[in-house]
Curated annotation (Swiss-Prot):
One of its GO terms (molecular function) is protein serine/threonine phosphatase activity. It is found in: Plastid stroma. The lineage of its organism: Eukaryota, Viridiplantae, Streptophyta, Embryophyta, Tracheophyta. This is Serine/threonine-protein phosphatase PP-X isozyme 1. Interacts with TAP46. Ubiquitous, mostly expressed in root mersitems, flowers, and vascular tissues. Keywords: Hydrolase, Manganese, Metal-binding, Plastid, Protein phosphatase. It comes from Arabidopsis thaliana (Mouse-ear cress). One of its GO terms (biological process) is reciprocal meiotic recombination. It comes from the Eukaryota. Mn(2+) 1 binds at D51, H53, D79. CDD domains: MPP_PP2A_PP4_PP6. Belongs to the PPP phosphatase family. PP-4 (PP-X) subfamily. One of its GO terms (cellular component) is cytoplasm.
Amino acid sequence: MSDLDRQIGQLKRCEPLSESEVKALCLKAMEILVEESNVQRVDAPVTLCGDIHGQFYDMMELFKVGGDCPKTNYLFMGDFVDRGYYSVETFLLLLALKVRYPDRITLIRGNHESRQITQVYGFYDECLRKYGSSNVWRYCTDIFDYMSLSAVVENKIFCVHGGLSPAIMTLDQIRTIDRKQEVPHDGAMCDLLWSDPEDIVDGWGLSPRGAGFLFGGSVVTSFNHSNNIDYIARAHQLVMEGYKWMFDSQIVTVWSAPNYCYRCGNVASILELDENLNKEFRVFDAAQQDSRGPPAKKPAPDYFL
């Protein structure tokens, strides 16, 4: 059994790797990711997944429902880390699968794959707690800079974490972005990771998130038409039912973190596409283990007995 297969087995038991193993894994991943396009081409059949947010046991549930990688070809649309209790194990497992089966799993960047955001929403603190230094956080956030910004399935389905940008009319314009950097505060790259579709907006609107834009149905129609795509698949927004179509099925939100933050009570979904791009949503609930909330603390030693 190779080192990598052993590490994958270990991560599937939610046991983190050593710091030196993380460093080596990230270096291997970098070599693979640097070759990918800003608009990564993906073949069907493929299963599309939305936000995971460090909910490791729920991701294990996702693999139970959707099948193991590499048997199933997966596309994860970002936000692997933050908010959940197991961002380290979640991200490292996905990264190890990417290194082991590069053609069977595609990882695109979400707005939480950023140094600034992870210092606020949990991943940085988790790395510090589990490793005693920020080195692992640094190795992982360096990898974030290499991740693709979007993907296109069979030239027909455009997949992105957040949404569209007023600076982007065509997929070719996305291809020209220099992605190997921290997510900027504004501009095309920021918008792709931060924007949201909104019913009550026609055209473009200001986003309450403070980054990206709100965009309406007419924007989606013209983007899809210009790029000859059938619809957009994206994540980024909690959907209580696990998925949600908008604008006459021109865009779909897929959300893959059930009982988000261990308290929202939502279901999650993944979108399975067969070789002819026929769609099947698989809806699933939180894993039993994870519905209990935070990981059990090891009992404190009984010094006083």
